[in-house]
Amino acid sequence: MKQLKLTGFVIFFFFLTESLTLPTQPQDVDDVRITQKFIDDNIGYITIIAFAQYIQEASFEEVEMLVKAMTEYRDKCLADRTLPECSKLANEVLLENICAMEGLPQKYNFSHCCHKVDFERRLCFFHNKKADIGLLPPLPTLDPEEKCQTYKNNRESFLNNYVYEVSRRNPFVFAPTLLTVAARFEEMTKTCCEEQEKANCFQTKAEPFIYYLKALSSYQKNACRALMKFGRQILQSINIAILSQKFPKIGFKQLTSLLEDVSSKYDGCCEGDVVQCIRGRSKVMSHICSKQDSISSKIKDCCEKKIPERGECIIYSNKDDRPNDLSLREAKFIESDNVCEKRDADQANFMAEFLYEYSRRHPELSTPELLRIAKVYKDLLKECCNMENPPECYRHAENRFNETTEKSLKIVQRECEHFQNLGKDDLKYHYLINLTKLAPQLSTEELTFLGKEMVMALTTCCTLSEEFACVDNLVDLVLGELCGINENRNINPAVDHCCKTNFAFRRSCFESLEADKTYVPPSTSQGLFTFHADLCQAHNEELQRKKDRFLVNLVKLKPELAGEELWSLLADFTNVVEKCCKAQEPEACFKEESPKLAAKSQAA
């Protein structure tokens, strides 16, 4: 149940999360001062996150050098804030120090960013981030006993190293989220190191916050992509839909005021300005709790808590009750004779208010669906307001809205039918084949990740009463992962079109896609059919990963094969592994059977 609530939170209210390591003073203390003290106290973590996210290839030793420089800068400024260098923005100082590290810009190929200034420099460092972390070595894993001993011997270095490894593998995750994960990691380490069954404890307790990290990572990347690719207006619309559903009694003027804080937060968070991101997050929470009477009846107890517990409390609070006087439909947008005049007076504000009114009346709809409805309404008014009798035209708006939702509902129902009819593994193979045919240019790691995410979305949502909103929200996040966040992300013309043309309708765009016609498969099998006895040593999970990779690489090699033929070859691969691992000489068996499977593939 907790996982389900977290899923709902990710979709509906992710920007309320606060770091569990934020200071513990009650809310009536000066928030700006508290937040600044937190930043000063945590300069080490903040520096590690920023550096490791900007320059993912940098070694831990290089990161430690920057931490030392930034700590000295902090101490100097705490002693005398009137010094000229202390008036600079923290992120500016950080980037200056990164650029000043001898030989580093040339070593990691970011010297071109150091030649830029201000916003252009920040943006350059942002675009230097790499979503594909295949370039990094595997995440180091320690034996539980060794992990506990390392923590006991040098807590600071142990935690710093953890923050470094997680940050460089999650370059687009907001700093407060990473700080939350780090705090939970330390709590888990303390608890599990006291247990007899340490390995089991670590495995059990790690799952929830790994899920938390993955879920928020997807949403944050999606939100930042919306901001950077489609502009502030789309991000504003997303936030209107989210807040109006969560807090249906909030007035439109109050919502507009809150949106100013929420939207400004994204500039720092999306650019990777760790300090501004933390400040922005704290400001949003303070705003909500200072106006709670006009925002929600569900958060009073939450706002009386200290900051570490406050964010979690609000996350898990229920959506506020719908106001008794809230009609089922807002007539002024459909039945009024002067809709066109109101729209023309201030189109942005008019459309924002429509989205607010529609969202607070429809808690059962997904965020993407609410954006689709808003787009349909906007296009309808564009058409109607040029007619002789506009009211007669837009009075049928609800029919258009219902048609739009019906189309989206059918897509979700079709996906949940796949979930009902196929087992978990077969469902994954279905999506691995489809995704690889659509975007064979993506790496094998990315495609296997996307396939697993699709399965998780359907497994999480398809048995719920709120199936539609849950599936539509989570699948939209998977498509956001596919589209990526960086400006230099180009996959193929058809996929790029869906990613870049219309944020609200990209789901239906992807539904209409077929296998990529521009893709040229490799001329050789590149070792795909070369198997060895090490397959017999693979544990179930590792063997499953190898099967997933085999299927994706098979589709890349033979994209023209139908799904049934691909499934048949995957079954043959499974049979070969089972047969040879039971043989007296597994290596000899693989040597004999591998060419047969390759020949069958060629003949298919």
UniProtKB/Swiss-Prot annotation:
Alphabetized SUPFAM superfamilies for the sequence: Serum albumin-like (SSF48552)
Superkingdom of this protein's organism: Eukaryota
PTM comment: N-glycosylated; more than 90% of the glycans are sialylated.
UniProt GO MF annotations: vitamin E binding
GO terms for cellular component: cytoplasm; extracellular space
SS bonds (residue pairs): 77-86, 99-114, 113-124, 148-193, 192-201, 224-270, 269-277, 289-303, 302-313, 340-385, 384-393, 416-462, 461-470, 483-499, 498-509, 536-581, 580-589
Glycan-linked positions: 109, 434
Keywords noted in UniProt: Disulfide bond, Glycoprotein, Protein transport, Repeat, Secreted, Signal, Transport
Residue ranges annotated for the Albumin domain, each copy included: 22-210, 211-403, 404-598
Pfam families per UniProt: Serum_albumin
Entry's Gene Ontology BP terms: protein stabilization; protein transport within extracellular region; vitamin transport
Subcellular location field: Secreted
CDD domains: ALBUMIN
Record's signal peptide: 1-21
Region feature (Binding pocket for hydrophobic ligands): 215-319
Function: Functions as a carrier for hydrophobic molecules in body fluids. Essential for the solubility and activity of lipidated Wnt family members, including WNT1, WNT2B, WNT3, WNT3A, WNT5A, WNT7A, WNT7B, WNT8, WNT9A, WNT9B, WNT10A and WNT10B. Binds vitamin E. May transport vitamin E in body fluids under conditions where the lipoprotein system is not sufficient. May be involved in the transport of vitamin E across the blood-brain barrier.
Domain notes: The second albumin domain forms a deep binding pocket that contains palmitoleic acid (in vitro). Palmitoleic acid is most likely not the physiological ligand. Instead, this pocket may accomodate the covalently bound lipid moiety of Wnt family members.
Family: Belongs to the ALB/AFP/VDB family.
Subunit-structure text: Forms a 1:1 complex with Wnt family members; interacts with WNT3A and WNT5A. Interacts with WNT1, WNT2B, WNT3, WNT7A, WNT7B, WNT8, WNT9A, WNT9B, WNT10A and WNT10B.
Official protein name in the record: Afamin
Gene: AFM
